[in-house]
Protein backbone atom coordinates (compact mmCIF):
# COMPACT_ATOMS: atom_id res chain seq x y z
CA UNK A 1 0.00 0.00 0.00
CA UNK A 2 1.41 3.38 -0.95
CA UNK A 3 1.65 6.02 1.74
CA UNK A 4 -0.49 9.09 1.04
CA UNK A 5 1.46 12.10 -0.12
CA UNK A 6 0.83 14.56 2.67
CA UNK A 7 2.86 17.54 3.79
CA UNK A 8 3.33 18.43 7.45
CA UNK A 9 4.59 21.61 9.08
CA UNK A 10 5.41 19.47 12.12
CA UNK A 11 8.85 17.94 12.58
CA UNK A 12 8.07 15.16 15.06
CA UNK A 13 5.47 12.58 16.06
CA UNK A 14 4.75 14.48 19.26
CA UNK A 15 1.46 16.19 20.05
CA UNK A 16 0.70 18.76 22.76
CA UNK A 17 -2.71 19.64 24.14
CA UNK A 18 -4.00 23.16 23.54
CA UNK A 19 -7.04 23.28 25.84
CA UNK A 20 -6.01 21.64 29.11
CA UNK A 21 -4.95 23.40 32.35
CA UNK A 22 -1.52 21.74 32.18
CA UNK A 23 0.29 20.48 29.08
CA UNK A 24 -0.44 16.94 27.95
CA UNK A 25 2.01 15.38 25.51
CA UNK A 26 1.38 12.36 23.32
CA UNK A 27 4.80 11.04 22.36
CA UNK A 28 4.90 8.62 19.42
CA UNK A 29 8.01 6.46 19.42
CA UNK A 30 9.84 3.87 17.38
CA UNK A 31 10.86 1.12 19.77
CA UNK A 32 13.86 -0.08 17.75
CA UNK A 33 16.33 2.44 16.32
CA UNK A 34 20.04 2.58 15.59
CA UNK A 35 22.67 4.95 16.87
CA UNK A 36 22.62 6.93 13.62
CA UNK A 37 18.99 7.92 14.26
CA UNK A 38 20.02 10.23 17.09
CA UNK A 39 19.76 13.03 18.14
CA UNK A 40 15.96 13.16 18.20
CA UNK A 41 13.84 16.19 17.28
CA UNK A 42 13.67 18.74 20.11
CA UNK A 43 9.99 18.04 20.79
CA UNK A 44 10.87 14.76 22.51
CA UNK A 45 13.12 16.50 25.01
CA UNK A 46 10.50 19.22 25.50
CA UNK A 47 7.75 16.70 26.26
CA UNK A 48 9.78 15.19 29.10
CA UNK A 49 10.97 18.52 30.50
CA UNK A 50 7.46 20.01 30.61
CA UNK A 51 5.79 17.02 32.27
CA UNK A 52 5.46 16.11 35.93
CA UNK A 53 4.77 12.45 35.11
CA UNK A 54 5.91 10.30 32.19
CA UNK A 55 3.79 7.24 31.40
CA UNK A 56 5.30 4.44 29.30
CA UNK A 57 3.59 1.38 27.84
CA UNK A 58 5.08 -0.70 30.64
CA UNK A 59 6.32 0.44 34.01
CA UNK A 60 10.05 1.09 33.48
CA UNK A 61 10.82 -0.30 36.93
CA UNK A 62 12.60 -3.64 36.27
CA UNK A 63 10.67 -6.79 37.11
CA UNK A 64 13.10 -9.62 37.94
CA UNK A 65 10.36 -12.17 37.26
CA UNK A 66 9.37 -10.84 33.83
CA UNK A 67 11.32 -13.37 31.77
CA UNK A 68 9.77 -16.26 33.67
CA UNK A 69 6.31 -14.75 33.20
CA UNK A 70 7.00 -14.35 29.48
CA UNK A 71 8.08 -17.97 29.15
CA UNK A 72 4.92 -19.12 30.89
CA UNK A 73 2.73 -17.02 28.60
CA UNK A 74 4.68 -18.02 25.48
CA UNK A 75 4.31 -21.79 25.86
CA UNK A 76 1.30 -24.05 25.56
CA UNK A 77 0.24 -25.72 28.82
CA UNK A 78 0.62 -29.39 29.67
CA UNK A 79 3.38 -30.06 27.15
CA UNK A 80 1.26 -29.32 24.08
CA UNK A 81 3.22 -28.83 20.86
CA UNK A 82 2.69 -26.09 18.31
CA UNK A 83 1.99 -28.58 15.53
CA UNK A 84 -1.45 -29.30 16.98
CA UNK A 85 -2.42 -25.66 16.50
CA UNK A 86 -1.16 -24.93 12.96
CA UNK A 87 -2.49 -25.54 9.47
CA UNK A 88 -0.47 -28.22 7.66
CA UNK A 89 0.91 -25.68 5.15
CA UNK A 90 2.02 -23.36 7.95
CA UNK A 91 3.66 -26.28 9.75
CA UNK A 92 5.68 -27.13 6.63
CA UNK A 93 6.60 -23.49 6.09
CA UNK A 94 7.70 -23.22 9.71
CA UNK A 95 10.23 -26.04 9.36
CA UNK A 96 11.75 -24.36 6.30
CA UNK A 97 11.97 -21.09 8.22
CA UNK A 98 13.51 -22.50 11.40
CA UNK A 99 16.29 -24.10 9.37
CA UNK A 100 17.25 -20.61 8.21
CA UNK A 101 17.55 -19.36 11.79
CA UNK A 102 19.25 -22.57 13.04
CA UNK A 103 16.74 -23.38 15.76
CA UNK A 104 16.62 -26.67 17.61
CA UNK A 105 13.10 -28.06 17.15
CA UNK A 106 13.10 -29.65 20.60
CA UNK A 107 13.72 -26.26 22.17
CA UNK A 108 10.93 -24.37 20.40
CA UNK A 109 8.18 -26.92 19.77
CA UNK A 110 6.18 -25.91 22.85
CA UNK A 111 6.03 -22.20 21.97
CA UNK A 112 2.89 -20.51 20.67
CA UNK A 113 3.01 -19.06 17.12
CA UNK A 114 3.27 -15.44 18.28
CA UNK A 115 6.21 -16.37 20.53
CA UNK A 116 8.11 -17.90 17.60
CA UNK A 117 7.39 -14.76 15.58
CA UNK A 118 8.74 -12.64 18.43
CA UNK A 119 11.86 -14.76 18.95
CA UNK A 120 12.72 -15.17 15.29
CA UNK A 121 11.69 -11.98 13.55
CA UNK A 122 10.19 -9.60 16.08
CA UNK A 123 6.66 -8.27 16.43
CA UNK A 124 6.37 -4.66 15.35
CA UNK A 125 5.78 -2.40 18.31
CA UNK A 126 5.50 -5.14 20.90
CA UNK A 127 8.49 -7.25 21.82
CA UNK A 128 11.10 -4.51 21.30
CA UNK A 129 9.50 -1.96 23.64
CA UNK A 130 12.61 -1.84 25.80
CA UNK A 131 15.18 -1.90 22.99
CA UNK A 132 18.48 -0.37 24.13
CA UNK A 133 18.48 2.17 21.28
CA UNK A 134 14.71 2.60 21.20
CA UNK A 135 13.09 5.97 21.84
CA UNK A 136 11.23 4.64 24.90
CA UNK A 137 14.50 3.61 26.54
CA UNK A 138 16.10 6.95 25.64
CA UNK A 139 13.18 8.92 27.11
CA UNK A 140 13.22 6.80 30.25
CA UNK A 141 16.84 7.80 30.85
CA UNK A 142 15.90 11.41 30.16
CA UNK A 143 13.02 11.26 32.64
CA UNK A 144 15.33 9.84 35.30
CA UNK A 145 17.82 12.60 34.64
CA UNK A 146 15.12 15.25 35.07
CA UNK A 147 13.76 13.49 38.19
CA UNK A 148 10.31 12.91 36.72
CA UNK A 149 7.70 10.58 38.14
CA UNK A 150 7.26 7.52 35.92
CA UNK A 151 4.69 4.80 35.53
CA UNK A 152 3.16 2.30 33.13
CA UNK A 153 0.00 2.39 31.05
CA UNK A 154 -0.43 -1.34 31.62
CA UNK A 155 0.92 -3.92 34.05
CA UNK A 156 3.34 -6.64 32.98
CA UNK A 157 0.48 -9.14 33.28
CA UNK A 158 -1.71 -7.05 30.97
CA UNK A 159 1.14 -6.63 28.52
CA UNK A 160 1.70 -10.37 28.33
CA UNK A 161 -2.01 -11.13 28.08
CA UNK A 162 -2.19 -9.14 24.82
CA UNK A 163 -0.38 -12.03 23.16
CA UNK A 164 -1.14 -14.96 25.43
CA UNK A 165 -4.87 -14.57 24.92
CA UNK A 166 -4.65 -14.18 21.14
CA UNK A 167 -6.71 -16.76 19.19
CA UNK A 168 -4.61 -19.37 17.37
CA UNK A 169 -5.70 -18.20 13.92
CA UNK A 170 -4.51 -14.62 14.55
CA UNK A 171 -1.25 -15.82 16.11
CA UNK A 172 -0.70 -18.15 13.14
CA UNK A 173 -1.22 -15.30 10.66
CA UNK A 174 1.31 -13.27 12.61
CA UNK A 175 3.85 -16.10 12.36
CA UNK A 176 3.25 -16.58 8.63
CA UNK A 177 3.71 -12.87 7.97
CA UNK A 178 6.96 -12.89 9.95
CA UNK A 179 8.32 -15.92 8.10
CA UNK A 180 7.30 -14.87 4.60
CA UNK A 181 7.69 -11.10 4.71
CA UNK A 182 10.38 -10.65 7.36
CA UNK A 183 13.01 -9.03 5.08
CA UNK A 184 10.38 -6.95 3.27
CA UNK A 185 8.88 -5.82 6.58
CA UNK A 186 12.34 -4.68 7.66
CA UNK A 187 12.67 -2.49 4.55
CA UNK A 188 9.19 -1.06 5.14
CA UNK A 189 10.06 -0.23 8.73
CA UNK A 190 13.14 1.65 7.56
CA UNK A 191 10.82 3.83 5.46
CA UNK A 192 8.45 4.25 8.41
CA UNK A 193 11.35 5.25 10.66
CA UNK A 194 12.61 7.84 8.17
CA UNK A 195 9.11 9.35 7.96
CA UNK A 196 8.69 9.25 11.74
CA UNK A 197 11.91 11.25 12.20
CA UNK A 198 10.51 14.12 10.15
CA UNK A 199 6.97 13.99 11.59
CA UNK A 200 5.40 12.59 8.42
CA UNK A 201 2.37 10.50 9.42
CA UNK A 202 1.80 9.05 5.94
CA UNK A 203 4.03 5.94 6.06
CA UNK A 204 3.23 5.06 9.71
CA UNK A 205 -0.49 5.31 8.94
CA UNK A 206 -0.07 3.18 5.81
CA UNK A 207 1.84 0.53 7.77
CA UNK A 208 -0.99 0.30 10.31
CA UNK A 209 -3.49 -0.05 7.45
CA UNK A 210 -1.41 -2.82 5.85
CA UNK A 211 -1.21 -4.74 9.11
CA UNK A 212 -4.95 -4.37 9.74
CA UNK A 213 -5.77 -5.66 6.27
CA UNK A 214 -3.51 -8.66 6.80
CA UNK A 215 -4.49 -9.57 10.38
CA UNK A 216 -7.29 -7.45 11.81
CA UNK A 217 -7.78 -9.61 14.90
CA UNK A 218 -4.18 -9.26 16.02
CA UNK A 219 -4.10 -5.52 15.33
CA UNK A 220 -7.23 -4.95 17.39
CA UNK A 221 -5.56 -6.71 20.33
CA UNK A 222 -2.25 -4.91 19.82
CA UNK A 223 -3.70 -1.44 19.27
CA UNK A 224 -7.45 -0.80 19.60
CA UNK A 225 -8.17 -2.55 22.90
CA UNK A 226 -5.07 -1.13 24.54
CA UNK A 227 -5.73 2.38 23.25
CA UNK A 228 -9.22 2.35 24.74
CA UNK A 229 -7.95 1.03 28.06
CA UNK A 230 -5.03 3.45 28.25
CA UNK A 231 -7.07 6.57 27.44
CA UNK A 232 -9.59 5.69 30.13
CA UNK A 233 -6.76 5.04 32.58
CA UNK A 234 -4.84 8.30 32.25
CA UNK A 235 -7.68 10.74 31.51
CA UNK A 236 -8.27 11.38 35.25
CA UNK A 237 -4.73 12.77 35.40
CA UNK A 238 -5.61 15.23 32.63
CA UNK A 239 -8.79 16.31 34.41
CA UNK A 240 -6.88 16.85 37.64
CA UNK A 241 -4.57 19.33 35.92
CA UNK A 242 -1.47 17.15 36.03
CA UNK A 243 1.14 17.68 33.31
CA UNK A 244 1.86 14.32 31.70
CA UNK A 245 3.67 12.78 28.77
CA UNK A 246 2.20 9.58 27.34
CA UNK A 247 4.98 7.66 25.61
CA UNK A 248 3.94 4.82 23.29
CA UNK A 249 4.67 3.38 19.87
CA UNK A 250 3.66 5.76 17.08
CA UNK A 251 1.06 3.24 15.83
CA UNK A 252 -0.98 4.05 18.94
CA UNK A 253 -1.44 7.62 17.67
CA UNK A 254 -2.42 6.95 14.03
CA UNK A 255 -5.04 4.74 12.40
CA UNK A 256 -8.48 3.72 13.70
CA UNK A 257 -9.24 4.11 17.40
CA UNK A 258 -5.90 5.75 18.11
CA UNK A 259 -5.28 7.41 21.47
CA UNK A 260 -5.14 10.92 20.05
CA UNK A 261 -8.49 10.67 18.26
CA UNK A 262 -10.13 8.98 21.25
CA UNK A 263 -9.16 12.00 23.35
CA UNK A 264 -10.23 14.45 20.64
CA UNK A 265 -13.67 12.84 20.60
CA UNK A 266 -13.88 13.71 24.30
CA UNK A 267 -13.17 17.36 23.57
CA UNK A 268 -9.41 17.59 23.95
CA UNK A 269 -7.44 19.39 21.26
CA UNK A 270 -3.87 18.68 20.18
CA UNK A 271 -1.27 20.26 17.93
CA UNK A 272 1.53 18.30 16.30
CA UNK A 273 4.94 19.73 17.15
What are these regions (language model features)?
Residues 4-5:
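N-terminal signal peptide c-region/cleavage motif recognized by signal peptidases
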Residues 11-222:
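Structured, acidic catalytic/metal-binding patches in enzyme active sites
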Residues 216-273:
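A cross-kingdom marker for long, charged
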Amino acid sequence: MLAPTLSYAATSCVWRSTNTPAPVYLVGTIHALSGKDYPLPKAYDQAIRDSKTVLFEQDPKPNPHYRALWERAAKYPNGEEIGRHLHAKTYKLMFAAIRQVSWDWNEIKYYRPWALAALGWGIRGYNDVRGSLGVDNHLEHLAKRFHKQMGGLESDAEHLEVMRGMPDIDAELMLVDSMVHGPKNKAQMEQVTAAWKRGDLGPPTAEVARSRQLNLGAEIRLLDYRNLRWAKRFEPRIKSGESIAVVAGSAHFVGPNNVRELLEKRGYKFEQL
